[in-house]
Amino acid sequence: MKTATILLTTFITLSAMSCSQPKGTKDYLKTVLDNLEEIQSATYYSRVETWHPGDTAVVYDLTYFIREYDNPSDTTIGAIEIQTSADNHSHLYYAYDGKMKASVFEEHKGIMIDSFKVDRNLPFRPVGPPFYNYTKSILRYILTTKDSITLEKRGNENTFHLKLTIHEDRQVEFFGRAYKIPDPPFRDEDPTSRYEIWIDKKTNLPYKYRREMSHNISAETVSDATFNNNKIEDVDVTGYFPEGYEIRYYGDKKKTSGDDVDNLIGNPAPGWTLTQTDGQEISLNNDKGKVVLLQFTSAGCGPCRASVPFLNKLTQEYPNADFVFYAIELTCKNISGVQAYKKRVNAGFNFLHGTEAVRDAYVIQAFPVFILMDKNHIVHKRITGYQASVDNEIRGLIHGLLK
């Protein structure tokens, strides 16, 4: 794709491959990158926010205290991160040291360790890099890529604001460096990737980025940063592990318990009362004597969106009073987010706004999950994930229960 440069008074659009970039822009980005390269360690507060596309309601908004270290010995991400509570800097949430990542689950008093021994068939290590490592990768990409990109520059006397748009046939993410993401099944979305970076002109360092994909939007803002006061030789992430927590390893089979998924089958479905997109409250008890199909879904889930055409047809195929279907969205913060998602995917069926209590009761750990119950609301079948073969499987199960 041929790139072009357009220069306006207050707005500049340029391509990294253009020879006619406004003088000073590329040199300034090199200066910022050089400053980032000088950071051997940093501590800062990090505010992380996420949104669903088309929805202004924030799904996730939390602030952490971060210890970040440059780690050249790690040829994947190239950094160490220790994420703790903003109020208690010893209270660990997450850590990555180049050899493993550790995630703390307080509700289960457990720590999940991933030593990357399980092959995920990915070209990158699935680790979210810390802020300065992440923005460094983006700037390095801008200065060196041969991809088709557009870079918009705005700003004022205090801030240099960049907006990077990547016009490739696959989305580009940054895990230590740029990677073109393999297309997942059922994704028919816009592959355009958009990144924005805000740079403080006093320090010539980034303080915020925003990442926008067709399936997810996120942003991170840092504050109160200090640099190069800590040594990587002193880092021991295991020293932050809370005492008494069970350590488990990614890939190990979990032992079954009274709360395990399999124990739902053959037992009465947990009851619930949830709000529909039209504001009406719906209770499972209202559908006594009906076969009920639930889909637990997420606005950010590609396979969930891919199932919508099938579910639209399904509700038309079984319009009688003996069958009812509900999609329960579990990641939107409010009903307006569910409404926006329903409209965006052209769903012609009922959407309910789920709760954490419902998520826990049905042991939902991934999306989508289908739960089919008989007329007595005994759980008959659970299906995790979606592919074309699921259509006929669900149709056959419903037909059998309606006899």
Which positions does each model-derived feature cover?
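N-terminal leader/targeting segments and the immediate start of mature chains
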Residues: 18-62, 66-70, 75, 144-151
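Conserved redox-active cysteine motifs that mediate thiol-disulfide chemistry
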Residues: 296-313
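Non-transmembrane domains of secretory- and envelope-associated proteins
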Residues: 186-193, 202-281, 287
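Thiol-/selenol-based redox modules, centered on thioredoxin-like
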Residues: 372-403
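Thiol-based oxidoreductase modules, predominantly thioredoxin-like and allied folds used
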Residues: 321-336, 347-356
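Short, internal strand/loop/helix patches
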Residues: 339-376
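Extended beta-strand-rich segments in extracellular/periplasmic secretory proteins, especially
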Residues: 132-201
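An acidic-aromatic
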Residues: 71-131
